[in-house]
Amino acid sequence: MNKLIQLALFFTLMLTGCSNSSTSSESKVETTVKTTAAFPQKELEKELKKLKPVSLDMKFESPLATELGKRKAKEEAEKQRQIAAEKKLEKEREAKRKKQQEEKAERQRLAEQQAAERQRLAEAERQAELERQRQAAIQKEQKANAEKKRQSQAQRQQTEAPSSNSQDPPSSSSQTDKTIQQPASELPDDDGYGYEERKKWHDDQVEWGIKQGYIDPEDAP
């Protein structure tokens, strides 16, 4: 509202000045007197001081330019929104790729761990089987050695028994072999030993003959 008053006063002063220049000197004096009478000098100066300079560079935008500006701003906002959405989508894709890589690495680690565990168990089982085979071989060898030792002792006893119980030594090696291979079926004659000793010798001979297959257990005396 103040601006309108200032503009009205400004145009009034301009019109007043123009009218004064087009009249005669008498009219000028009369108009000056009238203006002075209507507007006192002090009041006029006071009003002039209140006036502010009006810029002549005022910009007037047309409705079309305004609409174009709004449309451009809207397009720019949409562009920024799309850029932000694309950045967000790219960030989500990157996080998904990273998660997939981590899951793949974890699966590979578990597979390698399971393979190593299976290999360890297979190796342990193989070592256990080798140990069982070794122990079985040792036991078999020990059993064979024990059997050989027992047979050797039995043969030595059979060899020593006739020579120690016989009154006369055998005249030849063939007689010794015959004595060893043919067990006595009856008690020997009295050769200076007691009955118990001769019976034991007889039983040993029969047992040896059964083991060697010379005497049938059912026919043993």
Swiss-Prot record:
Bias (Low complexity): 162-174
**Comp. bias intervals (Polar residues):** 152-161, 175-184
UniProt-annotated stretches for the region Disordered: 67-221
- Keywords recorded for this protein, A-Z: Coiled coil, Signal
Q: Which residues form the signal peptide?
A: 1-23
Skewed-composition ranges (Basic and acidic residues): 68-150, 195-205
- Coiled-coil residues: 70-161
Q: What is this protein called?
A: Uncharacterized protein YscB
Q: Which gene encodes it?
A: yscB
